[in-house]
């Protein structure tokens, strides 16, 4: 009783009498019940109604005259005669338009069960598909209750003698249905209800003294005794899924809830219960104040007609009374069209319409019953936005009352719906920092925090100096559990001086740049920073060494150089405790790390030498820098032995073949550092023999000048001419070197004698004795050449005379052909045959097979063709000479004409293999052309 009295009472339903429509035409079928002032009068039901039910859009009534009445939503009452005497029980199925009824057609105790198909008509009335006696045996007994399963396969009938019959099969047909006695007892059956759970069907049976359940979907119908007290008629009901389909039994002391196999909770609702219903999550109980034995329900119903009755609507989930009102002589309570309808003995129908959720919530808000409002909203399945609004109002209420701890808990429940800044502004006061911390923690746990929220939360931790909470916040087990922006957290912790926490975040979440910044800029732990870089993957190790390499080189040069060597050769991360190290090694470009070694030449030299040895295919910049470094060391070295060693190293590097493509750069480096041996070596490699010669000339190294000429004179003969000119200008006694040069010039015929004499004439110390031997040898050679030319001329003349005689003989004398063999096949000559004046004879078929022309001898044709080609070439040159002379005379710019002919290769020497008599024509033509060219050029100048 105490618990019941503590339940709050509300008016969540509106009551009004149902009124008749304006007229027969005033309401269309399916229209809402008319209950306003426009109605003419209140609706009045027929008298003598004994039983009621509802479903399929209608209220169904049975009366003492045997009629069944239907009241649809249009409030147009219709009925038909179902029994001859009276109707005692009705059950309207909710999923099928089937009505089951129990009544009497004759006097005595002989109740009949009728099944009506309301969708089919028989003479204007619903079709009765089945009629059978309710009593299974011969002993008369009164039906006390009736229930039907929605699948139409089960129907149970309870009797006052304590028995229960079960109809199994299609209840609408006799031949498909089987009736058997399920239960026998000593107490009247007051309530029945089917409960479906999966494929299992239970039947609850309640009497005045006990509660039981049966499994009717299987064999043997196992029974479970649930309780040893029962209830009166119409004081039991089955709840909806919101209460897990529990069977409700309302006794005078308590209301009990049952599962098929056990008893559930109970509620201390005192008072004599008359009617129990379940409506949309509410328990509806009609009771009266004075206590009457439940057994009197079977003996003296009329004695109750004048009693005052109270209807209470209970919300069992939220533990409040949603409505309570008194009525006179309630016949029954029905639920249809989303409302409750209370039928009273005077024929009136009272409608109880539930208020909308928002109205109910506002009523609770006015009384500051926020917890109850929250529970109500959840039971009414209010959406998350609506719930968040309630949480916010509840939080505001608690905050205004000074209950900040409670307020923040409500604000936490709004996360995801309410803008966080609304809550944060309320708790920014330093005294409420722990509440703000709790809110921000939850915001992060739900992954709804931004960078500003993370910053604020970490600042709260640091102000509270709560290291344990801080560590708990940042030390998550996995990446998926991180509910904050890691980079923001690192920044805040670093700024607050929590370096170890910032390092933990940076290392565990792979923020390598932040980790190195803190180690190098804040903690100055260079060794640890270098170790950390050494265990990173290749790409990240490379980028971080480029970024922080100079700093590390400045403080720990040797260790940094060692890491760079590995990074550029065969890098493998030094990951502790990890067995699956990278299978493929990576290699960085060593040239890109050279700037890191600024102001560290010793480490740079070690790095470059290591790369050149271990990785011969290193970038060219490595070798260029190494050469420059060695030349600098050589130039600044004072110790002779060390300088000699550096000299050898520099020369060795130059001879390594790495500077072929960057010859100019290496040459500039050697010249900048005055490394003469390197300069000369590069000159020689670049075939710059003139520069080598000039170098020795500048340093008056006579023997080296001669050596250069001897070594490279074959490739560049002009070196001897330059050497002769050089020695000729020397006022010193250079006879030995001049003689050596002249010997080579004379042997190779490199210069005309006249030019040699003119060159030596510039030397005032040179005498005729220097070139006497040269001139004598030259004159002797020319004399020999003249003798050979004269001999050749005589031979050409004799040959010419002989040929002329042959030509004359051919013209004047007959030619006798005496050849007996073919000149081609060398077989005996047979007719027909072909003869030529040259003396060759051929078979006709051989001649036709081998000759290119009928007028030419196949044997003489190759030699004749050479002569003809030479003649044509001479004719072309003669024509070209005439054309050249004409253009030269007509042009204002003679030099342009000459240059054009030179460019076209006109003056190139034409070489032909000809007979000796014709050879002398070409030199004369060329000599004449060149002589005319020179003369004309002189006149032009």
From Swiss-Prot:
Alphabetical UniProt keywords: Acetylation, Autophagy, Coiled coil, Cytoplasmic vesicle, Endosome, Lysosome, Membrane, Metal-binding, Methylation, Nucleotide-binding, Phosphoprotein, Protein transport, Repeat, Transport, Zinc, Zinc-finger
Modified residue annotations for Omega-N-methylarginine: 904
Primary localization class, coarse: membrane
Gene Ontology MF term list: nucleotide binding; zinc ion binding
SUPFAM superfamilies in alphabetical order: ARM repeat, RING/U-box, WD40 repeat-like
PTM sites of type N-acetylalanine: 2
GO cellular component term, pick one: early endosome
Zinc finger (RING-type): 822-861
Location of this chain's protein in the cell: Late endosome membrane; Lysosome membrane; Cytoplasmic vesicle; Early endosome
Record carries keyword Phosphoprotein: yes
GO terms, biological process: autophagy; intracellular protein transport; vesicle-mediated transport
Coiled coil: 772-813
Chain positions found as Phosphoserine: 813, 924
CHCR repeat start and end residues: 411-561, 572-736
Membrane-related topology note: Peripheral membrane protein
Assembly information from the UniProt record: Core component of at least two putative endosomal tethering complexes, the homotypic fusion and vacuole protein sorting (HOPS) complex and the class C core vacuole/endosome tethering (CORVET) complex. Their common core is composed of the class C Vps proteins VPS11, VPS16, VPS18 and VPS33A, which in HOPS further associates with VPS39 and VPS41 and in CORVET with VPS8 and TGFBRAP1. Interacts with RAB5C. Interacts with TGFBRAP1, MON1B, STX7, STX17, ECPAS, EZR, RDX, MSN. Associates with adaptor protein complex 3 (AP-3) and clathrin:AP-3 complexes. Interacts with PLEKHM1.
Homology family: Belongs to the VPS11 family.
PANTHER family linked to this entry: VACUOLAR PROTEIN SORTING-ASSOCIATED PROTEIN, VACUOLAR PROTEIN SORTING-ASSOCIATED PROTEIN 11 HOMOLOG
Function summary: Plays a role in vesicle-mediated protein trafficking to lysosomal compartments including the endocytic membrane transport and autophagic pathways. Believed to act as a core component of the putative HOPS and CORVET endosomal tethering complexes which are proposed to be involved in the Rab5-to-Rab7 endosome conversion probably implicating MON1A/B, and via binding SNAREs and SNARE complexes to mediate tethering and docking events during SNARE-mediated membrane fusion.
Protein name: Vacuolar protein sorting-associated protein 11 homolog
Organism whose genome encodes this protein: Mus musculus (Mouse)
Lineage, uppermost ranks: Eukaryota, Metazoa, Chordata, Craniata, Vertebrata
